[in-house]
UniProtKB/Swiss-Prot annotation:
Belongs to the TtcA family. It catalyses: cytidine(32) in tRNA + S-sulfanyl-L-cysteinyl-[cysteine desulfurase] + AH2 + ATP = 2-thiocytidine(32) in tRNA + L-cysteinyl-[cysteine desulfurase] + A + AMP + diphosphate + H(+). Its EC number is 2.8.1.-. It comes from Escherichia coli O45:K1 (strain S88 / ExPEC). SUPFAM superfamilies: Adenine nucleotide alpha hydrolases-like (SSF52402). The thiolation reaction likely consists of two steps: a first activation step by ATP to form an adenylated intermediate of the target base of tRNA, and a second nucleophilic substitution step of the sulfur (S) atom supplied by the hydrosulfide attached to the Fe-S cluster. The gene is ttcA. A motif (PP-loop motif) lies at residues 47-52. Keywords: 4Fe-4S, ATP-binding, Cytoplasm, Iron, Iron-sulfur, Magnesium, Metal-binding, Nucleotide-binding, RNA-binding, Transferase, tRNA processing, tRNA-binding. This is tRNA-cytidine(32) 2-sulfurtransferase.
Length: 311
């Protein structure tokens, strides 16, 4: 009995560390990009997946200790997909005591009507969903719309655009919506997917499957995700280094004439970013930029199940 109690304490200790890391990551992202301001009303988009559940939980947690006042309203879009468990999210949110709104729109029917059988439906579905969420944000008086994309999503998008789109373009932590009326934020921008997965497992969130519409996964994104996971296993710290690179862009040493005036370089011009010194042999740090070994990494692997609560 004492041994079981000791194991429980150990689990609680390590999971508290995990939650603190997620809180720290979210807090840093909020501060770096000025995501949340005094008096904000944040519309938290809740899909029923691990990412959005974690985002809501961490924002609720930060709300209690933040130096500013802000409110949260959770919003789920019920798209009338066959098999969607309508009771799950209302029951969960009622238990938490969180303000929420369930928006019912038969976008599934519209997509099935417009898109021929066998063709991908994700693009049209995404546009419809985005428009409904923007409208709902206006109706609720929300000043910010929070989405649950994390660090891995951002890196995947960068590589997708490089490999398939010919652009160095990622997924910004904060942006203006395409209708020019809403600010969209991604509070999990600095969070690792594997941390989110562990947290979701520990909290036993009532996960709703994401493939109820019957659509096929984005195979290109899946290839990129598998590649990054493989790199993360074989070369610890590479993911952190790549994400750090997204925050340390040097336009003068790329090739985009819209970002840097290469034609303006003439004799007597100022040396920019070290000039050709940048091509000298650099000392590569032994430890990848942005990466720190974690004492509890192996311990957390053992704690994916059999945990009741993280306080």
């Amino acid at each position: 009995m004492q041994e079981n109690q000791q194991i429980t304490k150990k689990e609680q200790y390590n999971l508290n560390k995990l939650q603190k890391r997620l809180r720290r990551n979210v807090g840093e992202a909020i501060a770096d990009f000025n995501m949340i301001e005094e008096g904000d009303r944040i519309m938290v988009c809740l899909s029923g997946g691990k990412d959005s559940y974690t985002m809501l939980e961490i924002l609720r947690n930060l709300q209690q200790s933040a130096p500013i006042n802000f409110s949260l309203v959770a919003v789920n879009l019920d798209q009338k997909q066959p098999g969607f468990p309508e009771h799950v999210l209302p029951e969960y949110l009622e238990t938490l005591g969180v303000e929420y709104k369930i928006v019912e729109e038969n976008t599934y029917g519209i997509v099935k009507e417009k898109i021929p059988e066998g063709k991908t439906t994700c693009s049209l579905c995404s546009r419809l969903r985005r428009g409904i969420l923007y409208r709902t944000a206006t109706e609720l008086g929300a000043t910010k719309i929070a989405l649950g994309h994390h660090r891995d999503d951002i890196l995947q998008t960068l590589f997708l655009n490089m490999f398939y789109g010919g652009k160095m373009k990622g997924m910004p932590p904060k942006l203006m919506s395409d209708d020019g009326k809403h600010i969209v934020i991604r509070p999990l921008a600095y969070c690792r997917e594997k941390d989110i997965q562990r947290f979701a497992d520990a909290k036993a969130f009532p996960i709703i499957p994401c493939n109820l519409c019957g659509s096929q996964p984005n195979l290109q994104r899946q290839v990129i995700a598998d590649m990054l996971r493989d790199w993360d296993k074989r070369y610890p710290g590479r993911i952190e280094t790549m994400f750090s690179a997204m925050q340390n862009v040097v336009p003068s040493h790329l090739c985009d004439t819209n970002l840097f005036d290469f034609k303006g370089i003439t004799h007597g011009s100022e040396v920019v970013n070290g000039g050709d010194l940048a091509f000298d042999r650099e000392e590569i740090p032994l430890q990848p930029s942005g990466w720190q070994p974690e004492e509890d990494e192996n311990q957390l692997d053992e704690l994916r199940l059999n945990v009741v609560e993280v306080k």
